[in-house]
Amino acid sequence: TLDRSSAASDVYKRQVWQWDLWQAGMGLVDFTNPDATAWYQAKLRELIAQGVDCFKTDFGERIPTEVVWADGSDPERMHNLYTDLYNRAVHDVLVEARGADDAVLFARSATAGGQSMPVHWGGDSTSTYASMAETLRGGLSLALSGFAFWSHDIGGFEGTPDAGVFKRWTAFGLLGSHSRFHGSSSYRVPWAFDEEAV
């Protein structure tokens, strides 16, 4: 818990922007502020000490424009920079704890230079053949941009795939460097579809 009278509490109150739009209690840390970054990294180190090996850096691209950044950055231009600052803050802690060769985060957003902090996944696709094709194009674009490792939500994230989409996406997804069955409203497990999927 956070001691409300501590210096860390003051950093939290001044440098974490909180909003309930996409999910309750979602907070964005101002990574342009070294104190806020250090506070956040200290929280990650506590989790690593408990055995956590990897962190998912989600929502790095949904940056509000009605905020004031500690370093004075233009809020309209933070869309790409924020994702780099966020992923870098997390990746640096993982490198410190696990070494450069074993540090892995699971990032949804990226910008130029992001390929140095693997792994990235394609975000929230829908459960359709068209979205699977979009995911493939996204992965090819990542590869052409120097990203050696990438992943995606097998079967799509939004909605529930039919058995055909799930099986085709599984075949495609298991050929990637990192595979993940994941969805927002239904389980993505083979036995939820049909015998052939198992």
What positions do the PLM features span?
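Short acidic-aromatic active-site loops that bind/stabilize oxyanions
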Residues: 1, 29-37, 79-80, 198
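Single conserved hydrophobic/aromatic residue that forms the stacking wall/gate
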Residues: 1-8, 12
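Detector for glycine-centered tight turns/loop "hinges" at secondary-structure junctions
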Residues: 13-15, 72
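Active-site loop and adjoining helix of the penicillin-binding protein/serine DD-peptidase-beta-lactamase fold
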Residues: 17-38, 45-46
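Active-site-proximal substrate-binding groove within the catalytic cores of carbohydrate-active enzymes
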Residues: 41-55, 60-198
